[in-house]
């Protein structure tokens, strides 16, 4: 499991097969507002992601997801 910090939000990248309910159980004191599936390619110089996430009660939005991922900060 990897934890990646983004400005004021935290992202947890789980292994394949994890569900949104698993994320909520792992972090009971935090509000989990989005769960999704992305493929990360991380090297020492850059982070790339492919895929889309689904915010709760909204539609998938690839453009917003890419905006989010471009602002990743290594924790």
Short names for language-model regions:
Residues 1-75:
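Intrinsic low-complexity, intrinsically disordered or marginally ordered coil/linker segments
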